[in-house]
């Protein structure tokens, strides 16, 4: 029994370390992408005539699909080349990561108390992390 407890704790520790590693990797990828976006902004703007649907909403979590549609439009209208290729590769990796995370939204059926606990946390996030628009 003691060995089982040790193995369980070891497994939890490994999962935690793995989650931290993925989070750190994603943080570095986003930071690199922001740098590339700054560096290549003028090239991406081009002649400035490209019109891309841009969300008005400031709660970016709600507009993920629209943001990535805009990225696809920008990618299709930008001259290919090594200069921006890494930027678009990074954006694709970020989208893949978000898509994988969205798969965690579908869950199992739990008792109402667990759902209410989740709902309470969800509303707390909306209350503290989202900008409320009028």
Swiss-Prot record:
SUPFAM superfamilies: 4-helical cytokines. GO terms for biological process: immune response; interleukin-5-mediated signaling pathway; positive regulation of DNA-templated transcription; positive regulation of immunoglobulin production; positive regulation of podosome assembly. InterPro entries: 4_helix_cytokine-like_core (IPR009079), IL-5 (IPR000186). Its main location: secreted. GO terms for cellular component: extracellular space. Homodimeric cytokine expressed predominantly by T-lymphocytes and NK cells that plays an important role in the survival, differentiation, and chemotaxis of eosinophils. Also acts on activated and resting B-cells to induce immunoglobulin production, growth, and differentiation. Mechanistically, exerts its biological effects through a receptor composed of IL5RA subunit and the cytokine receptor common subunit beta/CSF2RB. It comes from Sus scrofa (Pig). Belongs to the IL-5 family. It is found in: Secreted. Glycans are attached at residues 76, 90. Keywords: Cytokine, Disulfide bond, Glycoprotein, Growth factor, Secreted, Signal. The keyword Protease does not apply. This is Interleukin-5.
């Amino acid at each position: 029994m003691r060995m089982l407890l040790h193995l369980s704790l070891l497994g939890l520790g490994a999962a935690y370390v793995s989650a931290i590693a993925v989070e750190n990797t994603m943080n570095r990828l986003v930071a690199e992408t922001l740098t590339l976006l700054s560096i290549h902004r003028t090239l991406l703007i081009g002649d400035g005539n490209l019109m891309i649907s841009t969300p008005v909403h400031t709660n970016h979590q709600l507009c993920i699909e629209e943001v990535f549609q805009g990225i696809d439009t920008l990618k299709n209208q930008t001259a290919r080349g090594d200069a921006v290729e890494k930027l678009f590769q990074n954006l694709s990796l970020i989208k893949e990561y978000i898509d994988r995370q969205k798969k965690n939204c579908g869950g199992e059926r739990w008792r109402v108390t667990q759902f209410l606990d989740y709902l309470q946390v969800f509303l707390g996030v909306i209350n503290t992390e989202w900008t409320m628009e009028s």
